[in-house]
Swiss-Prot record:
Keyword Iron-sulfur attached: yes
PROSITE patterns, sorted: ACONITASE_1 (PS00450), ACONITASE_2 (PS01244)
Pfam families to which the protein is assigned, alphabetical: Aconitase
Cofactor info, note text: Binds 1 [4Fe-4S] cluster per subunit.
A GO biological-process term: L-leucine biosynthetic process
Entry cofactors: [4Fe-4S] cluster
Reactions listed under catalytic activity: (2R,3S)-3-isopropylmalate = (2S)-2-isopropylmalate
HAMAP family attached to this UniProt entry: LeuC_type1
Protein name: 3-isopropylmalate dehydratase large subunit
Residues the entry annotates as binding [4Fe-4S] cluster: C348, C409, C412
Organism domain of life: Bacteria
Organism field: Magnetococcus marinus (strain ATCC BAA-1437 / JCM 17883 / MC-1)
The protein's assembly and partners: Heterodimer of LeuC and LeuD.
Similarity comment: family membership: Belongs to the aconitase/IPM isomerase family. LeuC type 1 subfamily.
Length: 467
């Protein structure tokens, strides 16, 4: 058999058939569901008189609309409450496992699933959510789907897809001190652009990726969609297997040994052809800060806001000018002179225990700047929150002046109580800096947890490499 990429191995193992027009039917191993994109899908099943074909393969959690404080008073927004309540009733009616509000396992869907061992190597995984690529960190093929596709997977445990192309992104060399997985993926997007991965599944490789922890790899894969890609993935190694072992939904006993033997084959074969290859030097990756309204509009923290007049492409130049106007920034401004109003540490990109530890190191023994209106830390799940509290991280944050919240998607997107006011500027560890993403006329700068924490202390962005 000819050499295969990791993607091809998983795709071929799940391929049921390919039609004449090139559309393929593939089997789906795991389906993740949340409250926003699932109600219409369940209603479609009811109208058609269908059951969920494999309820044991679907797992649900409310996250987008869940408030992160004052939970005792319940969900006050009627639409949010309806969506959360509807998810619970649908899961009960169709026999689906749900980790509801009050369950320690509840939290952001893309933090919960790896934590529970639901995300496993070699699996196909889908969710009605853009950032499903997160689970590709496990050597899985994971991607977001639309609501009609959610219904299709619930009804059939299969999905119609066009086979994407493959791109290998090799990040070689040692990452400098102060730079993180978040900086790697922002740097990649800054290089290839938000359309650079369109039509591709990205495989992240090279020594810098191999050196990352599993949580770091999840951060990188999480933002593959922001490069326009269908999915992102990392080959299985000993770190992958060690992370999965012993988790609630991971295989046990003989099944574990059999699974590990198969998982160890989940890497691209020597000489396997990719449709595109990008090679980057990790030594060039400084801490990154986005300055515009797209993740590709990013600069090193020791750099300046770029000047659109230096951009030869007219379309890009126009986009840069529009972004600067929206963000209220002047070309040539040093990144370290950009002051922020609020700081958000959380989201499916950066709310795991390692993220919180990194942020805590940056704030320990210090105080949030008087100019900061709000600095909040939102753990990814109740279990992450519990572990952080056992390690005393909550006290470090609260003594510094941060708010320590309950799990949820929170300020990543304006779908709950945690929103920016018009014109407010936020240092955010989330994944999207689009216009209005964190609230009407909000201004979002994407950074790593340590960079966000340091900005809260200083009141503006700082180069964390300078101590």
């Amino acid at each position: 058999m000819s050499a295969q990429t990791l993607f091809e191995k998983i795709w071929n193992a799940h391929l049921i058939r390919t039609d004449e027009d090139g559309t393929s039917l593939i089997y789906i191993d795991r389906h993740l569901v949340h409250e926003v994109t699932s109600p219409q899908a369940f209603e479609g099943l009811r109208l058609a008189g269908r059951k969920v074909r494999h309820p044991e393969a679907t797992f649900a959690v409310p996250d987008h609309n869940v408030p992160t404080k004052d939970l005792a008073g319940g969900i006050k927004d009627p639409v949010s409450k309806l969506q959360v309540d509807t998810l619970a009733s649908n899961c009960q009616a169709f026999g689906i496992t749900e980790f509801g509000v009050g369950d320690l396992r509840q939290g952001v869907v893309h933090v919960m699933a790896p934590e529970q061992g639901i995300s496993l190597p070699g699996f196909t995984m889908v969710c009605g959510d853009s950032h499903t690529a997160t689970h590709g960190a496990f050597g899985a093929l994971a991607f977001g789907i639309g609501t009609s596709e959610v219904e299709h997977v619930l009804a059939t445990q299969t999905l119609m897809q066009k086979k994407p192309k493959t791109m290998l992104i090799q990040v070689e060399g040692e990452l400098p001190a102060g730079s993180t997985a978040k900086d790697i993926i922002l740097y990649i997007i800054g290089n290839i652009g938000t359309a650079g991965g369109t039509g591709y599944v990205l495989e992240f490789g090279g020594s810098a990726i191999q050196a990352l922890s599993m949580e770091g790899r999840m951060t990188v894969c999480n933002m593959a969609i922001e490069a326009g890609a269908r999915a992102g993935m990392v080959a299985v190694d000993e770190k992958t297997i060690a992370y999965v072992q012993g988790r609630p939904y991971a295989p046990k006993g003989e099944a574990w040994e059999k699974a590990v033997a198969q998982w160890q084959t989940l890497k691209s074969d020597e000489g396997a052809p990719f449709d595109a290859v990008v090679t980057l030097d990790a030594r060039n990756i400084a801490p990154q800060v986005t300055w515009g309204t797209s993740p590709e509009l990013v600069a090193p923290v020791d750099g300046c806001v770029p000047n659109p007049t230096d951009e030869p492409n007219g379309v890009k130049r126009g986009a840069m000018e529009k972004a600067l106007a929206y963000m209220g920034l002047q070309a040539g401004t040093p990144m370290t002179e950009i002051a922020v109003d609020k700081v958000f540490i959380g989201s499916c990109t950066n709310s795991r225990i390692e993220d919180l530890r990194a942020a805590a190191v940056a704030v320990a023994g210090k105080k949030v700047a008087a100019s900061i209106k709000l600095a909040l830390v939102v753990p990814g799940t109740g279990l992450v929150k519990q572990q952080a509290e056992q390690e005393g991280l909550d006290k470090i944050f609260m003594e510094a002046g941060f708010e320590w919240r309950e799990p949820g998607c929170s300020m990543c997107l304006a779908m709950n109580n945690d929103v920016l006011e018009p014109g407010e500027r936020c240092a955010s560890t989330s994944n999207r800096n689009f216009e209005g993403r964190q609230g009407k006329d909000s201004r979002t700068h994407l950074v790593s947890p340590a960079m966000a924490a340091a900005a809260a202390i200083a009141g503006h962005f700082v180069d964390i490499r300078n101590g």
